[in-house]
């Protein structure tokens, strides 16, 4: 009778062992305990009765147990293929692992477990358990990114040396060329943003500065005529040594200013109280006695006293043929100097 197969002492399963491996090991331990009890009872029975059928059944059971151990250890004929088919490729580190998927480093089905515990070594019974360093400290994101090729690598020392050699070959003019290129980039970016650059923005239009004589001549012409024809504008521009566009713009600005002044005066007149703007002439109640009456003697006394004579009103600024007089402030349009001046015909 062959010697019974005894299992060596099993160590505590590693923390990195998968749930499936732990279940298989637990089932194996239970089967081994039952096999040991069955072997003792069968030995007693074999001592009493040597039955060849019981011996064949025991050998078949032992062969099944051996195949299970080989399956867990990944040894024996077809053991690796069966382990891969049962536990998935790369789960036990049997052979090369498949490339990780595009998912996050710890997602299931994307090689996360293989990247978490990439290295394994042989343990009890030819089994596999993760390395202690891998079990205690997972890989950092940088190492996983390098393994997957997701992060670009920086330039090595060779690239720096090549760039230094190129700059040395180009000479001192290389620095000025690079500076000019860098200066052109913000300028081009400013032009693309609607012509607003970083330095000064849009081009500011130059403002024409008129001399005192030119302003006096322009003001005099404006007092006579608000709008100029093309011939008058050309003659005035030639006499003042200005362009027709400059004369035209000056007249436009001057007309706008004149309109604003008129609007302000009308608004001030509408806000002032109307009683202060109207003056009424009071008729004289009595006249002085003529010289003949004065020589005859004083007039007879009246039974009632006469009211004192009202003071004479101030002379009106602008008189009319009626009994009423109004001050000039009642007519703000007439108060302006240009209104009093004669207007030339031909207004546009």
From Swiss-Prot:
Q: Which CDD domains match?
A: homeodomain (cd00086)
Question: Which PROSITE patterns does its entry note?
Answer: HOMEOBOX_1, HOMEOBOX_2
Q: Where does this one sit in the cell?
A: Nucleus
Q: Name one Pfam family in it.
A: Homeodomain
Give any Gene Ontology cellular component.
Answer: chromatin
For bias type Acidic residues, the affected ranges are 42-57
Q: Which SMART domains did the record assign?
A: HOX (SM00389)
> What spans are recorded as compositionally biased (Low complexity)?
166-175
Q: Which GO terms describe its biological process?
A: negative regulation of DNA-templated transcription; regulation of transcription by RNA polymerase II
Q: Where is the composition biased (Pro residues)?
A: 96-105
According to the UniProt entry, which residue ranges have a biased composition of type Basic residues? 61-70
SUPFAM superfamilies per the UniProt record, alphabetical: Homeodomain-like
Q: What is its main location?
A: nucleus
Q: Biased composition, Basic and acidic residues: where in the chain?
A: 132-146
Q: Where is this region: Disordered?
A: 29-203
Q: Which UniProt keywords apply?
A: Cataract, Developmental protein, DNA-binding, Homeobox, Microphthalmia, Nucleus, Repressor, Transcription, Transcription regulation
Residues annotated to bind DNA: 203-262
State the span of motif (HMX family specific domain 1): 263-273
Task: Extract one GO molecular function annotation from the record.
Answer: DNA binding
Residue ranges of the motif HMX family specific domain 2: 276-289
Family that this chain belongs to: Belongs to the HMX homeobox family.
- Disease in which the protein is involved: Oculoauricular syndrome: A syndrome characterized by microphthalmia, microcornea, anterior segment dysgenesis, cataract, ocular coloboma, retinal pigment epithelium abnormalities, rod-cone dystrophy, and anomalies of the external ear.
What this protein is reported to do is described as: DNA-binding protein that binds to the 5'-CAAG-3' core sequence. May function as a transcriptional repressor. Seems to act as a transcriptional antagonist of NKX2-5. May play an important role in the development of craniofacial structures such as the eye and ear.
Indicate what this protein is called per its UniProt record.
Answer: Homeobox protein HMX1
Species of provenance: Homo sapiens
Q: Which gene encodes it?
A: HMX1
């Amino acid at each position: 009778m062959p010697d019974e197969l005894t299992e060596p002492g099993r160590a505590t399963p590693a923390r990195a062992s998968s749930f499936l491996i732990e279940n298989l090991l637990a089932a194996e331990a239970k089967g081994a305990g039952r096999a040991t009890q069955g072997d003792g009872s069968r030995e007693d029975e074999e001592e009493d009765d040597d039955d060849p059928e019981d011996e064949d059944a025991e050998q078949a059971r032992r062969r099944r147990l051996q195949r299970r151990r080989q399956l867990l250890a990944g040894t024996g004929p077809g053991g690796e293929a069966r382990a891969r088919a049962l536990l998935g490729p790369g789960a036990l580190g049997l052979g090369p692992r498949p490339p990780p998927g595009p998912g996050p480093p710890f997602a299931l089905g994307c090689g996360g477990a293989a990247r978490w515990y990439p290295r394994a070594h042989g343990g009890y019974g030819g089994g596999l358990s993760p390395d202690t360093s891998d079990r205690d400290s997972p890989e950092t994101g940088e190492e996983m990114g390098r393994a997957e090729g997701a992060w670009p690598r920086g330039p090595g020392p060779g690239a720096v040396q090549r760039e230094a050699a190129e700059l040395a070959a180009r000479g001192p003019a290389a620095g000025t060329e690079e500076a000019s290129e860098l200066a052109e980039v913000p300028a081009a970016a400013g032009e693309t943003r609607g012509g607003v650059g970083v330095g000064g923005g849009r081009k500011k239009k130059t403002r024409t500065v008129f001399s005192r004589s030119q302003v006096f001549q322009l003001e005099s012409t404006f007092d006579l005529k608000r709008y100029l024809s093309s011939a008058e504008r050309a003659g005035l521009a030639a006499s003042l040594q200005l362009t027709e566009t400059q004369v035209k713009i000056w007249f436009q600005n001057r007309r706008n200013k004149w309109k604003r002044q008129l609007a302000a005066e009308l608004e001030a007149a509408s806000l002032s109280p109307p009683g202060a703007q109207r003056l009424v002439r009071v008729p004289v109640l009595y006249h002085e006695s003529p010289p003949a009456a004065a020589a005859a003697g004083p007039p007879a006394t009246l039974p009632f006293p006469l009211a004192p004579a009202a003071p004479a009103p101030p002379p009106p600024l602008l008189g009319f043929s009626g009994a009423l007089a109004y001050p000039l402030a009642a007519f703000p349009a007439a108060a302006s100097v240009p209104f009093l001046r004669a207007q030339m015909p031909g207004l546009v």
